[in-house]
Design a protein with these regions (language model features):
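Short glycine/proline-enriched turn or capping motifs at secondary-structure junctions
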Residues: 3, 755-758
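Glycoside hydrolase catalytic-domain context in secreted enzymes
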Residues: 20-734, 740-754, 763-765
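Gram-negative bacterial Sec-dependent N-terminal signal peptides
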Residues: 1-19
Length: 765
């Protein structure tokens, strides 16, 4: 073993040398060797030990360390989550080696969604980069830091397609588009797992939440999902499959019901599709407490029935409840659950432990004890350079009237807003083991950028919200939002006074991190009224007004778009967020981000997404007609469309040229455009290619993203960007649930966003 110097392992191996000799060694990490090893190990296990492997518990008040020690001794734990230090992880693994009969190692997991100790932009921000190299950076750094903490698995990436910004977990995914989410998720899986999850600085991923969790009705957390098979497989399933095809070792099962059946009890989903059709060999993990929730769903009569239904459906590991350990022994004894079913689930768990290399070295992600950091949160453990680079790419310039931006590093700048100096909020939700006092706020970033060159005036200006009900909700478990006791008017007056003295006002506004999180669905997606009042007062000063948005979902910004001279969408930018945002504000970095999700004008437009189907009476603003698909009290399209984002320079895109007007089924057509930087600054933009199946056996979207390329051009420079199109890009699930491409005309759209495109067409023969 690699780190045999661990005292716990040495003692345990000395006590039972024969068993240890068989269990641990230099096992080949091949499917054949794994299957033989696990088959042999299963023969040595008791029923209780097999059940114990299916139990995933959280360290916390419900499971103090003393209680966990006894569970480990009795072989009643398979994995642990929510502990993130080498010291704690080593102690529990030592207990396995010293106290348990078979010494089957634990694996340790955590929600490493957009960073571990270094916090990167939230996934919605990362998607805004449209840069797979940025995704790889986040994945590799996150895996390195997680593995360096002793972790073996992350509950990520989240690849739920979301087209409803009311849903709080929209922040955790990659947006509204199937293709973008698929390729981002696939890239993240490969980056985090590296060549093998057994590698010292790699971790196993768990694609989540299977399936269609992002389509919950009304954007309400944990709600039901009901949709056709065609929509499910065309729009929502591809990202999961892409992540699994990339090699993800685990799947987290969604909390929602799908077409009337909770995913946790859906054997069609977990066996017929996941195992049989897709060939998945890893583990399925329930979401937190999901098995007991089957009773409230109404698909299980009691706890025992819930366990029976879940295991038979294909849920291998039970997260954060005691139901499997409590009720499976009786179900096995009665024959309601067979030994073969139990063995299948246990085999899946042991398989991933083998793939993690834990049977070669249970301490593979820990290293020798003497290498443990004296300070877990040491500054030296952070990757600030990478965090800043990725955060800059996540910023989207939404508006820039009269070239308000970039700002000068001179004069007087008023920095206001409740989020301007919040170290906690800039990290966003699911910020893993990130420490708030290590993050850079927007105020600090601006101060760092200007040094002594400009005078900075700061005023909070408003609370996040003055709605007591919302504040109480956000502070239910801790004081996440601190409320200034001053009157709203006094705070606004202070900010206005600062603005009047300044040459320009930078207002940092939006949501707190807790407003864009699990269980944080909103019916109103405007900026809270307290901040809207502040913006209105700042506008009245007549000073140039720059809005820096900090949020985890699209916001309805019609009024703010009218008031502001410039708007930056920065999402929750992470540990280096303030420095990265300042880089963009002052022109040290030219923004290149693009929106991965459409911004509605109002909540009444939802869902608004670019890849919708046409109706028989589509709205055409150039030909007004009362009887068309539109709202009569609101403009028809989004405020900002998918793929939208400005730059400090300008670009032109030529007409589309095609290599051929026709395409054979086994051939390709290449679509090309010439892109020119027509401005005065070097800049990057994302050239996006969309396809439309004009006439098919069922209605097809008006356009679908099928390719993109991020390019950087100097002033006056041009580049030809080409996209090869093959048969796979044209396929869809038809009415007969056959995945195929149909002959006929296809339109090709290429441009800088989903609305501003040039068009060509070809025919599939």
């Amino acid at each position: 073993m690699k780190w045999l110097c661990s005292v716990g392992v040495a003692v345990s191996l000395a006590m039972q040398p024969a068993l240890a000799e068989n269990l641990f060694g230099n096992h080949p990490l091949t499917p054949e060797a794994r299957d033989a090893f696990v088959t042999d190990l299963l023969k040595k296990m008791t029923v209780d030990e097999k059940i114990g492997q299916l139990r995933l518990i959280s360290v916390g008040p419900d499971n103090p360390k003393e209680a966990i020690r006894e569970m480990i001794k009795d072989g009643q734990v398979g994995a642990i989550f929510n502990t993130v230090t080498r010291q704690d992880i080593r102690q529990m693994q030592d207990q396995v080696m010293a106290l348990s009969r078979l010494k089957i190692p634990l694996f340790f997991a955590y929600d490493v969604v957009h960073g571990q100790r270094t916090v990167f932009p939230i996934s919605l921000g990362l998607a805004s980069s449209f840069n797979l190299d940025a995704v790889r950076t986040v994945g590799r750094v996150s895996a390195y830091e997680a593995a360096d903490d002793g972790l073996n698995m992350t509950w990520a990436p989240m690849v739920d397609v979301s087209r409803d910004p009311r849903w709080g977990r929209a922040s955790e995914g990659f947006g509204e588009d199937t293709y973008l989410t698929s390729i981002m998720g696939e890239t993240m899986v490969k980056a985090m797992q590296g060549k093998s999850p057994a590698d010292r600085y790699s971790v196993m991923t768990s694609v989540k939440h299977f399936a269609a969790y992002g389509a919950v009705e009304g954007g309400k957390e944990y709600n039901t999902v009901d949709m056709s098979s065609q929509r499910l497989f065309n729009d929502y399933m591809p990202p999961y499959k892409a992540g699994l095809d990339a090699g993800s070792g685990a799947v987290m099962v969604a909390l929602n019901s799908l077409n009337g059946t909770p995913a946790t009890s859906d054997s069609w989903l977990l066996k017929d599709v996941l195992r049989d059709e897709w060939g998945f060999k890893g583990i399925t993990v329930s979401d937190h407490g999901a098995i007991k929730e089957l009773i409230k769903h109404g698909t299980a009569a009691d706890p025992e029935d819930a366990v029976r239904v879940a295991l038979k459906a294909g849920v291998d590991m039970s997260m954060a409840d005691e139901y499997y350990s409590k009720y499976l022994p009786g179900l096995i004894k009665s024959g309601k659950v067979t030994m073969a079913e139990l063995d299948d689930a246990t085999r899946h768990v042991l398989n991933v432990k083998y793939d993690m290399g834990l049977f070669n070295d249970p301490y593979s992600h820990l290293g020798p004890k003497e290498s443990d950091p004296a300070d877990t949160n040491a500054e030296s453990r952070l990757h600030r350079k990478e965090a800043r680079e990725v955060a800059r790419e996540s910023v989207v310039l939404l508006k820039n009237r009269l070239e308000t931006l970039p700002l000068k590093k001179s004069g007087t700048i008023a920095v206001v807003g409740p989020l301007a100096d919040s170290q906690r909020d800039v990290m966003g939700s699911w910020s893993a083991a990130g420490v708030a006092n290590q993050s850079v706020t927007v105020l600090a970033g601006i101060q760092n950028a200007v040094g002594d060159g400009a005078k900075i005036l700061y005023a909070k200006g408003a609370n996040i919200t003055n709605d007591k009900g919302i504040v109480d909700f956000l502070n239910l478990y801790e004081e996440a939002v601190k409320i200034d006791p001053r009157s709203p008017q006094a705070m606004i007056d202070e900010a206005v006074q600062a603005a009047k003295q300044a040459d320009v006002v930078v207002a940092v506004v939006g949501e707190s991190q807790g407003m864009a999180h699990e269980a944080s669905s909103r019916t109103n997606i405007t900026i809270p009224q307290s901040q809207r009042d502040l913006i209105t007062a700042l506008k009245a000063t007549g000073k140039p007004l720059v809005l820096v948005l900090m949020n985890g979902r699209p916001l309805a910004l019609v009024k703010e778009d009218q008031q502001a001279d410039a708007i930056l969408e920065t999402w929750f930018a992470g540990t280096e967020g303030g420095n990265a945002i300042a880089d963009v504000l002052f022109g040290d970095y030219n923004p290149s981000g693009k929106l991965p999700i459409s911004f509605p004008r109002s909540v009444g437009q939802i869902p608004v997404y670019y890849s919708h189907l046409n109706t028989g009476r589509p709205y055409n603003p150039e030909k007004p007609n009362k009887y068309t698909s539109r709202y009569f009290d609101e403009a028809n399209g989004p405020l900002y469309p998918f793929g939208y984002g400005l730059s400090y320079t300008t670009f032109t895109v030529s007409d589309v040229t095609l290599s051929s007007p026709t395409m054979q089924r086994d051939g390709k057509v290449t679509a090309s455009v010439k892109v020119t930087n027509t401005g005065k600054r070097e800049g990057a933009t994302v050239i996006q290619m969309y396809l439309q199946d004009v006439t098919a056996s069922m209605s097809r979207p008006v356009k679908q993203l099928k390719g993109f390329e991020k390019i950087t051009l100097k002033p006056g420079e041009s580049k030809t960007v080409s996209f090869p199109i093959d048969i796979e890009a044209l396929k869809f699930w038809n009415q007969q649930m056959k995945y195929d491409a149909e002959p006929g005309k296809f339109n090709v759209f290429i441009g800088v966003d989903s609305a501003r495109v040039k068009q060509g067409s070809f025919e599939l023969l």
